Amino acid sequence: SGGNRYFPNSGVSSLGHAIPAAIGARFADTASTWAIIGDGGFQMCCMELMTAVNYDIPLNVVLFNNATMGLIRKNQTQQYERRFIDCDFVNPDYAALAQSFGIGYRRVADARDLEALFAQDDLTGAINLIEIPLDKDAFPNYLSKR
């Protein structure tokens, strides 16, 4: 069936899956393609942006930046009394990284930035890195309630 699709990677591990999967999806369908990824997973596959550049594959990457391995931190919060081991890290300057790849970069710090992003910017036909900073201790609630 037509329409929009969202293909999450769940069960095995999500780290590093979104960008290569979005590139593959773009080969199958020329519709606007978005990859949604956390900063931990992004650091495992950011070089795949160069694949998109080399093959001129339009792609929008939404990067949630909380400077931590979010699911690991959530687990250590809930099950280990906030004793954090090896989940936090230092991120690169994502604007400089995007510039080094020759791709677009936008930072969305609040709702106004998000509205402006979609109202003013043409996000089609190019490769864009869209960084959204998040609080490292704000965890999503999943349907499984875990």
Residue map of PLM features:
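Thiamine diphosphate
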Residues: 1-146
